[in-house]
UniProtKB/Swiss-Prot annotation:
The 4 large subunits of the cytochrome b6-f complex are cytochrome b6, subunit IV (17 kDa polypeptide, petD), cytochrome f and the Rieske protein, while the 4 small subunits are PetG, PetL, PetM and PetN. The complex functions as a dimer. Its main location: plastid. Gene3D superfamilies: 2.40.50.100, Cytochrome f large domain, Single helix bin. This is Cytochrome f. Component of the cytochrome b6-f complex, which mediates electron transfer between photosystem II (PSII) and photosystem I (PSI), cyclic electron flow around PSI, and state transitions. It is found in: Plastid, Chloroplast thylakoid membrane. Heme binds at residues 36, 56, 59-60. Binds 1 heme group covalently.
């Protein structure tokens, strides 16, 4: 009887341990997967400022190009592609958080007009799904379905990102009209230089916080440096901490100025933004245009036939 109770207790503890382990794994993976979009989502209600600047530029300081391609016009309740291209040299390597070199990742934010949103999976064609790859898009906010974010994803595979977009129908959404609308996009390649709290990452240049003489350079066991500067004004010691990644540019005994670079700038990535325009086209207007073109063509045909008939009558009268 005691053995049976012991077995039940062991079984219960193992079950509890496995359940807790699974929960920790899921939470950890979720936080890692969502780390990039959360940087902007937690800090800003809207990723596009009143000036037109996209807030990702606050952390990704280098300016790089980005391109967007959308149809000139779409019909209501239609799925279409918005293609975002984030070009960069695939041979480049970036500094990772641990100071080692690795491949660049990319990310993008697509700001659509109100009413436009990510297409549901059952509306996406197999051809479009093949172009999309294994990307997981998400809305910037549950209440802002027109703003879509993606990343970080491997740049080697996804420097061109296909967004599946569903256009709104003014018949069901009264605040949507048949007009020309702007679309804004921001895209980055590589890690940022500043974290949302204002602290520097190891993917940027580090400058001297005091003028003076470099009295000591200590290489840390896990990488990086502690640089001790004897202040030129009063001789007190200032210690600058350099994380693993950037290459050191100064040496012991060297005189340096305030804000002089102590390291190289390891950043090889950057952020860019662009825009495009799209027309939400009224089907009745399209039908009217087609009817007008058809009537013009028919009128031309009848005019040609009438002219030939008139020429035949003239020829007959001349012969008579």
């Amino acid at each position: 009887m005691q053995n049976r109770n012991t077995f039940s207790w062991v079984k219960e503890q193992m079950t509890r341990f496995i359940s807790v382990s699974i929960m920790i794994y899921v939470i950890t993976r979720t936080s890692i997967a969502n780390a990039y979009p959360i940087f902007a989502q937690q800090g800003y209600e809207n990723p596009r400022e009143a000036t037109g600047r996209i807030v990702c530029a606050n952390c990704h300081l280098a300016n790089k190009p980005v391109d967007i391609e959308v149809p000139q016009a779409v019909l209501p309740d239609t799925v279409f592609e918005a293609v975002v291209r984030i070009p960069y040299d695939k041979q480049l390597k970036q500094v990772l958080a641990n100071g080692k070199k690795g491949s660049l990742n990319v990310g993008a934010v697509l700001i659509l007009p109100e009413g436009f949103e990510l297409a549901p999976p059952d509306r996406i064609s197999p051809e479009m799904k093949e172009k999309m790859g294994n990307l997981a898009f998400q809305s910037y906010r549950p209440t802002k379905k027109n703003i879509i974010v993606i990343g970080p994803v491997p740049g080697q595979k996804y420097s061109e990102i296909v967004f599946p977009i569903l256009s709104p129908d003014p018949a069901t959404k009264k605040d949507v009209h048949f007009l020309k609308y702007p679309i804004y996009v921001g895209g980055n390649r590589g890690r940022g230089q500043i974290y949302p709290d204002g602290s520097k990452s190891n993917n940027t240049v580090y400058n001297a916080t005091a003028a003076g003489v470099v009295s000591r350079i200590l290489r840390k066991e896990k990488g990086g440096y502690e640089i001790t500067i004897a202040d030129a004004s009063d001789g007190h010691q200032v210690v600058d901490i350099i994380p693993p990644g950037p290459e050191l540019l100064v040496s012991e005994g060297e005189s340096i100025k305030l804000d002089q670079p102590l390291t190289s700038n390891p950043n090889v990535g950057g952020f860019g933004q662009g825009d495009a325009e799209i027309v939400l086209q009224d089907p009745l207007r399209v039908q009217g245009l087609l009817f007008f073109l058809a009537s013009v063509i028919l009128a031309q045909i009848f005019l040609v036939l009438k002219k030939k008939q008139f020429e035949k009558v003239q020829l007959y009268e001349m012969n008579f």
